[in-house]
């Protein structure tokens, strides 16, 4: 039963991804902002910052910071405005901390800032990548480097996995699986470039550069996966939420995507010369 639930959710996710990534623009920006806020809520709950299921003023300031950063990046696509939004969020959180002292402890302040920064800053890179030149194609590399990597790593690990990658944190993951995930992502990325980017740009070199970008993204995606797992282990929870049947929460499904998105964005800018 769980298999079919997970499969059904996966199909729905793929369909929604197709709709929103093809749409791009304000639609995708709004979706990224919604994902950021949902993931923020999941992290706040996981880290036990909220009390009695109610948001405090401190957490509300973190949420406002996410909205401010998302709006700044959508409207300007300028990292200077983004940095300004992050600074304002920090100042707002500290303002609440100082003028409500000793209601909040320092570790609560740092946790709120972390929970807001993690999804709030990383999710918008999906939107920013979509807005690059060739962005309607490049944005898919984020998911090739995360979800394809995850699938290839799982299949490779099942077939030949012997050496543990992170035995304490994730006993089922193997070094062989991790390598298989990277290789699989590189191959799928190369195929994707051959089918879409070479006809679009006329450059045969795209196949090699995109394979490299996909491989780099796949390496980082596995760090993202393990990072989210570490937080769950620290707080003794199985899943971040139940919003996606069979998968858990937004953080459970997008943990690797969050780390991959900025890597794909910056490598696309640096190696491919993509611009807004």
Show the residue positions of the predicted features.
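Membrane-embedded alpha-helical bundles of polytopic integral membrane proteins
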Residues: 1-215
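Transmembrane alpha-helical segments of integral membrane proteins
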Residues: 95, 194, 223-239
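Short helical (or helix-break) motifs at transmembrane helix termini and adjacent helical loops
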Residues: 147-158, 221-233
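Hydrophobic transmembrane alpha-helices of multi-pass small-molecule transporters
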Residues: 185-186, 253, 260, 269
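Hydrophobic alpha-helical transmembrane segments that constitute the membrane-spanning cores
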Residues: 188, 192, 263-268
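Hydrophobic transmembrane alpha-helical segments of multi-pass transport and channel proteins
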Residues: 215-223, 250-258
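Interfacial loop-to-transmembrane junctions
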Residues: 233-256
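Juxtamembrane boundary at the C-terminal end of a transmembrane helix
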Residues: 266-276
């Amino acid at each position: 039963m769980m298999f079919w639930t997970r499969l059904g959710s996966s199909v729905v996710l793929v369909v929604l991804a197709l709709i929103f990534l093809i749409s791009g623009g304000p639609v995708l920006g709004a979706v990224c902002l919604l994902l950021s806020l949902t993931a923020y809520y999941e992290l706040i709950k996981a880290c036990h910052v909220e009390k009695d299921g109610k948001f405090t003023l401190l957490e509300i300031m973190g949420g406002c910071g996410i909205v401010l950063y998302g709006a700044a990046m959508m409207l300007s696509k300028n990292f200077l405005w983004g940095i300004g939004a992050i600074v304002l969020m920090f100042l707002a959180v500290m303002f609440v901390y100082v003028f409500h002292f000793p209601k909040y402890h320092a570790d609560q302040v740092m946790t709120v800032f972390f929970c807001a920064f993690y999804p709030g800053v990383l999710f918008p890179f999906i939107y920013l990548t979509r807005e690059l030149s060739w962005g309607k194609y490049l944005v898919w590399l984020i998911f090739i480097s995360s979800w394809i990597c995850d699938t290839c790593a799982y299949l490779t690990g099942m077939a030949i996995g012997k050496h543990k990658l992170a035995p304490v944190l994730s006993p089922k993951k193997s070094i062989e699986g991790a390598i298989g995930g990277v290789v699989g992502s590189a191959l799928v990325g190369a195929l994707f470039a051959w089918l879409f980017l070479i006809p679009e740009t006329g450059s045969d070199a795209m196949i090699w550069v995109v394979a490299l970008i996909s491989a780099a993204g796949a390496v980082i995606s596995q760090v993202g996966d393990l990072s989210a797992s570490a937080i769950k282990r620290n707080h003794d929870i199985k899943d971040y939420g139940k919003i996606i049947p069979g998968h858990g929460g937004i953080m459970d499904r997008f943990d690797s995507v969050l780390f991959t998105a900025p890597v794909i964005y910056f490598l696309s800018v640096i190696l491919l010369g993509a611009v807004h």
